[in-house]
Amino acid sequence: MSKKEDPAHASAADDQARVFPKFLELTADESRALLARHNVGRIAFSMNDRIDIQPIHYVFDGDWLYGRTSHGSKFATLARHSWCAFEVDEARDLFDWDSVVVKGHMELLDPELGSPDAYTRGLELMRSLVSGTFTEGDPAPHRSILFRLRASELTGRAARPGP
């Protein structure tokens, strides 16, 4: 056995290559695929000079994230300051994960005040996730506000174990 093949003679460079993870950027297509695979993420927004992060369920469609929320501080804040960020992760291990961050403006969907087509599309998508959305059998009737977030900025990152 040569020195190179003998584990007792492994070089420091070989040890580092085995130990250190690789960090990568995801392509836009990989980022969109990750968003499409999941339905729970976190929305981040500024409220009272602080950053707040809340979990939400969502459906991704093209360049839009559709979700629903309830009246309250998050809704009031986002109605006035619509710029926000959204993140979803897929973690398999400490150094084996994918993460996507979306930044953009949140738009409240109301068929009477805005685009009825956008509202209808959002409702269809949310019903594909929770069939009783906005019906008598809705499991979360307090979440009565439909919104969408345009993926104006999309950034994907990943970590992979070392070689």
Give the ranges of each region predicted by the language model.
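Charged, gly/pro-rich active-site loop segments
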Residues: 2-22, 90-163
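Short, basic/aromatic recognition patches
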Residues: 16-42
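Short beta-strand segments
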Residues: 38-70, 86
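Helix-adjacent hinge/juxtasegments
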Residues: 67-97
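Short connector loops at helix/strand junctions that flank enzyme active sites
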Residues: 38, 53, 60-62, 79-83, ...
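Generic marker of residues within folded, mature protein domains
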Residues: 33, 48, 76, 94-96, ...
